[in-house]
Amino acid sequence: MAARAAVQAAAAATKGKKIIRHKMKEDVKMAELSPMMKQYLRIKSENEDSILFFRVGDFYEMFFDDAKKASDELDLTLTGKDCGMEERAPMCGIPYHSCESYIARLVEKGYKVAICEQVEDPKTAKKLVDRDIIRVITPGTVIEDAMLDEGKNNYLAAIALTEDGVGLCFTDASTGECHLTSFPADNYNSAVSDELLRFAPREILAADSLKAKSAALWEFLQENFKAAVTLRPNDAFDPKKTEELFVKHFGISELEDRGIDKTSSKAAALGAVIGYLYETGRTGSISVNKIDVYTDKQFMRLDMTALRNLELTETMRTKSKRGSLLWVLDRTKTAMGKRLIRSWLEKPLLNITEINLRQNAIEELCDDTIMRAEITEQLSGVRDIERIMTKVVYKTASARDLLAISATAHSFPAIKNLLAGAKCRMLREICGGIDPVEEIVTLIDDAINPEAPVSVREGDIIKGGYNEEVDFIRGDMSSGNSFLTDIENREKERTGIKTLKVRFNKVFGYYIEVTNSFLDKVPADYIRKQTLTNCERFITEELKEIERRVLSAKDRIEQLEFEIFDGIREKVAAELKRFQATASALATLDTLCSLAGVAVNNRYCRPLVNNSGNIIIKSGRHPVVEQVIKTPFVANDTTLNMKDDRCAIITGPNMAGKSTYMRQTAIIVLMAQIGCFVPADSAEIGLCDAIFTRVGASDDLAAGQSTFMVEMSEVAEILKNATKHSLLILDEIGRGTSTFDGMSIARAVLEYVADKKTLGAKALFSTHYHELTAMENELQGVKNYNVAVKKRGDDITFLRRIVPGGADGSYGIEVAKLSGIPETVIRRAKQMLKKTEEEGVVTYRTVENPDMQLPLEMQGAQDILHDLQTIDVNTLTPIEAMQTLFEMVTKAKSI
């Protein structure tokens, strides 16, 4: 209410004065400005790319262009403020104590917010209060809880282009974790895009020269990301400066100590991130310590299409967690565990040893139900110490944050005891990684008041008995307050006013309140201060003296308590690495317990993961679908290998379950490679280096692409990037164009995928082109499967079983009937089908002799024939082959 009244008063004050409506640089005359406005413009000139929150009393105020932007984005009243000129400066403001929600809204929209605080006490300032920027908040540097999703990392990325290639750095400023990789200069666009999509950063740092160096990469960043792209000076990516920053931050002289060549693109990207965090943080310290240097060979490749189609972390339709694989697997108890299990899902492993380590830990937790239950109970009380410790380092942590650290650390010994008898290596390593930090727990418990307020500047945060000076001042204040009680009793007796009260407020300080019925008894030494409806308020010289003494003591103790607290906070910050190591261990334990619990509850099995190249699944189930349907899920087998069963052609009607089955197989492979148990009776999974999917139909109207063009673009990317160790999920290739075009493309793609001379990858290939089933007898490694259907008269029942052989019909009319198409339409469709069948249909005929002369007697046929004869299939890339096919089809249609 007070804040609203202040804004209304400011708005009323603007009447009669014109508000400046133009850009400040063009219209403001510095010589005419007030001292505070000169100070504002000086600070603003150093932060032109940010909205400046300028602290004035209990408000953050914005002026000029910033005021206009903020009023529009935050729905604030745009008013004006005297600035020394004839016109008033545009102004809007928000209460400082509720600033986080406003900052969050601006940051969400991609703005940077510079926080300018009063860095000296206004009470002691002789002239203008000194102000300075204490922090710049950007989408990628947020550390405030209110602006973060506890279950997601908030990554800041940097892209460094150097002569040796491109370096990528992904850092979560709120947790301190940092991931670093690089790619060679000859082919990095697709790899960079995959990593950016995997980490989904909120902000991307790039050099000013990026657009000139790589127009394709710049265009990709602009078109495919909601992330804010922040351009930085080219020298921010200078590896020489990176080394200086490393020395400053890590206390080492050589980047090589962490396995990073100091002239590499990785070093340049890391340096850009660290420099930016120091620049925006303004505290002289940051929480980045955990640097993970990785290569793309460590993790399964998952491109944007696969991440979307497999619905790993969110559904395609609603973009929500519910209905995704993460929704099924995430039973974690800590925020740190929630972030880690998401990371595991997005980065399946390619190292069998690491996979087995996770499997062994999950198996032990599955078998020891009591241990798992007790660990889970302990983890339920663990707070997000990763992010709390970052606040400690940035000096924004409150006393309550330190109490949360202590409360969490009290559970560490119990968790270590539960793991003390663990058999598997991973659980033993977790046990060793949990540091009880007893001395920090003792310090916090001894020093911090359990009932401490949120603010660290208002006192009452240091526990009694911890500091003698604090106790002494509190005693002095207490005696002052007891003296006030004595005054009240004495004045009641002296004046005979039984209702007399001695009270305090921030406006008048200490005062005596007398009701109207006793005003005739007020003595002459009372000084009238305020008249209210039912009473009047008075002060005396004695009260003012007590007030000066008490308030002076209050100021002293608030400052003293803050200094003591700040010292304790620095001691806690010094143990950052210990807390981060413990947080990492707890997150891993939480994730393993979650996966073990889900495995037990959902009857998952431990898969055999090896290098055989086989995918053999017995009674596999879709982990998400089986949780949401009301009827029992129909399990299916899958057999793929590198010899006779590389490619499975799957036919059958729509709605029968082909897409579910194909996604289910891909998800089981992915689950196995994160070390998770899988929904099947048994499974052997040969490592897959990538999963590629082409599922469903969608237009990209914004890019001017039809459903068919989107489909072909995705297929081209798959054929370009897949290897023989990849798993391909290809659903209805070619359905977006005419029947014969589509069938030709589908066959060409399947031949390319199945043939070992071109690719030879494992694939599930669903199609409505039943003519393609002939390929089982023509191409080694291709097998036919179909979705079993039971037909009675005109009715069909989907059995959801995948069985060998091609489908005996498309059942399109029957499916249309099930979907509710009017009976008259169904009857007409049957008539048309019968007529077509009676008149004969054109079937696909395999060309057995590639050298035979085709009967092309129409005009222009010789040109097409010549083109065919001159094509060198061995030198064409997949995308060139696709383009050539399009051109020939177009030419044929024009004849």
Stretches with model-predicted labels:
Residues A2-T14:
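Compositionally biased low-complexity segments, especially N-terminal hydrophobic helices
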Residues K17, K25-E364, E377-S380, D384-V393, ...:
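Charged catalytic and DNA/RNA-contacting regions of genome-maintenance
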Residues F64-A67, T263, K333-T334, R339, ...:
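ATPase nucleotide-binding head domains, primarily ABC-like/P-loop NTPase cores
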Residues C116, P139-L148, G284, A420-M426, ...:
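Active-site phosphate-binding and catalytic loops of NTP-dependent enzymes
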Residues G165, N234-V247, M300-R301, L312, ...:
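Amphipathic heptad-repeat alpha-helical coiled-coil/stalk segments that mediate oligomerization
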Residues L196, P201-A212, E219, E542-E575, ...:
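Conserved catalytic alpha/beta cores of large enzymes that bind or transform nucleotide phosphates
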Residues Y394, S398, T408-S411, G464-G465, ...:
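Charged, surface-exposed helical/loop "interaction arms" that form contiguous linear patches used
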Residues N505, Q869-I895:
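Terminal-proximal interaction/regulatory segments of ATP-powered molecular machines
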